[in-house]
């Protein structure tokens, strides 16, 4: 009798641990896909903002590749994936360092204070901040999580 109860407890523990593993996998996949969806939304906003760079050094460069996702990693009891604007310090010829300014804008700059010669300012396009604000993470996460869990049940 005692042996039968131990066997039932052990199988129940194994079942719960397998469910936890599978739900963690599903959560990891859902976080990853949500990160990709957010990145793609920010890239679409950047393309539609009408930003053109005419500098000869940056002619072939694609600014959209400066909006990137990081790897999925564990943070405490959950998973995390960063979506960010990259500044490429290795390749000085890529225009990615401009993305932060294009997103948030700059104040008007002056060359010399005595003559008040204006160099200009960059108007904020807010392609990244609008993507983050409009992205409905909870809905997307629940939708993807339900799909992944339904695949596991089959």
Regions found by a protein language model. Name each.
Residues 1-93, 104-154:
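Short, Lys/Arg-rich flexible segments
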């Amino acid at each position: 009798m005692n042996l039968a109860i131990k066997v039932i407890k052990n199988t129940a523990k194994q079942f719960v641990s397998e469910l936890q593993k599978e739900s963690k996998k599903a959560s990891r996949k859902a976080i990853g896909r949500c990160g990709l969806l957010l990145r793609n939304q920010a890239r679409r906003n950047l393309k539609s903002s009408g930003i053109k760079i005419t500098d000869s050094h940056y002619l072939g460069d694609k600014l959209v590749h400066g909006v990137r996702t990081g790897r999925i990693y564990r943070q405490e009891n959950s998973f995390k994936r960063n979506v960010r604007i990259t500044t490429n310090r290795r390749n000085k010829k890529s225009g990615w360092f401009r993305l932060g300014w294009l997103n948030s804008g700059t104040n008007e700059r002056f060359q010399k204070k005595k003559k008040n010669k204006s160099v200009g300012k960059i108007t904020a396009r807010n392609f990244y901040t609008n993507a983050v604000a409009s992205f409905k993470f909870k809905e997307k996460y629940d939708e993807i999580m339900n799909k992944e869990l339904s695949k596991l049940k089959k």
